[in-house]
Amino acid sequence: TLAAAQGGARCCHVDASKGMVAWARENAKLNGLEDHPIRWIVDDVNKFLTREIKRGRRYDAILLDPPSFGRGKGGELYKIEHALLETLQLVRKVMSDQPSFLYLTSHTPGFTPIVLKNLIQELLGEGQLDSGEMLLTGKESALDVPSGTWARWKK
């Protein structure tokens, strides 16, 4: 969200965790971005996307970092292996007719770069797709530590 806002994008940051949204807002403030156009939404992403579809809102770019596991306000259970496909189908419906990109990350074992790439390929079809591992590199170690995976689709 912050990188997109810093680049001039109008952003909508959605997270089901009130604490995470508060932390992200504080991070925006610490980085001098408190006056940038960012909508901070505490909500279940699938419920939010469903409302945005009904409102006719469309987005040119989506950055999606779903949790492996979570619980909603009403005790609803979110497990990425059961919910991600629905989330991606809703994402497709809110993307504009001329989308710029979709960036998807995962920190869930088994969700390899190829898995993410295949999910996006099925969803969006034509476009440039690439994927990889997120790595933590240490100054004092020659070893990289994997911290997740990513896939990016762009027109």
Which stretches of residues belong to each language-model region?
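S-adenosyl-L-methionine
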Residues: A16-L63
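Active-site proximal loops enriched in glycine and acidic residues that flank catalytic Cys/His/Asp
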Residues: D15, A24, V42-D44, L63-P66, ...
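Conserved beta-strand segments of alpha/beta enzyme cores
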Residues: R10, P37-R39, Q128-D130
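Conserved SAM-binding loop of SAM-dependent methyltransferases across substrates and taxa
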Residues: T1-C11
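Short, well-ordered secondary-structure micro-motifs
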Residues: T50-I53, K73-G75, I114-V115
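C-terminal catalytic and target-recognition region of SAM-dependent MTase-like enzymes
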Residues: P99-K155
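Mobile active-site "lid"/loop adjacent to the S-adenosyl-L-methionine
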Residues: G19, V42, D60-L90
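Helix-to-beta-strand junctions that scaffold the AdoMet/dcAdoMet cofactor pocket
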Residues: M95-D97
